[in-house]
Amino acid sequence: MSAFITFEGPEGSGKTTVINEVYHRLVKDYDVIMTREPGGVPTGEEIRKIVLEGNDMDIRTEAMLFAASRREHLVLKVIPALKEGKVVLCDRYIDSSLAYQGYARGIGVEEVRALNEFAINGLYPDLTIYLNVSAEVGRERIIKNSRDQNRLDQEDLKFHEKVIEGYQEIIHNESQRFKSVNADQPLENVVEDTYQTIIKYLEKI
């Protein structure tokens, strides 16, 4: 039984922490791997450093680098795992590019979708968990968080509000594969809600 499950959300949604907690619960009963974008494979991790830790760059260059990392990650890690019947939990995927580069950066959602369609070759997630948090709460968490801030963390509040608007538009248009989880709750509640959502999906396939 294979399943491709992605996690999406704005900065400060707690997404990376939630996916880690959910993974450690699922791995007790399922053949599951956890990975991330950009990154997940050596080439992808190098691209991650460029786009998240480097200086400002042309927005289309940024979009193309994310797509290139995505392709390499799919070919080397995600597709082989799915062929082996694994459950793949992925921290970000195509919807991040649509919301961040397509919507918030202003390139255009359909333009970025076309670029990423070439990269993913039709491989959309079976289920996408969207961790729903307001831009204000997300920003507060980023400021309080001890981790180093990347280029996206450092964008202003207006940018993060546009990211959320982008996600809302995507979810409206593709509601069949999205499940929204209230990420304004305490972390343990977010983890539990996310875990139960995934379990319900896996029990049906």
From Swiss-Prot:
MF (Gene Ontology): ATP binding; dTMP kinase activity
GO cellular component: cytosol
EC number(s) from the headed UniProt entry: 2.7.4.9
UniProt-listed PROSITE patterns: THYMIDYLATE_KINASE (PS01331)
Binding annotation for ATP: 9-16
Highest taxon listed in the record's lineage: Bacteria
InterPro entries in UniProt: P-loop_NTPase, Thymidylate_kin-like_dom, Thymidylate_kin_CS, Thymidylate_kinase
UniProt keyword annotations, A-Z: ATP-binding, Kinase, Nucleotide biosynthesis, Nucleotide-binding, Transferase
Similarity-based family: Belongs to the thymidylate kinase family.
Record-given protein name: Thymidylate kinase
Lineage of origin: Bacteria, Bacillati, Bacillota, Bacilli, Bacillales
UniProt gene name: tmk
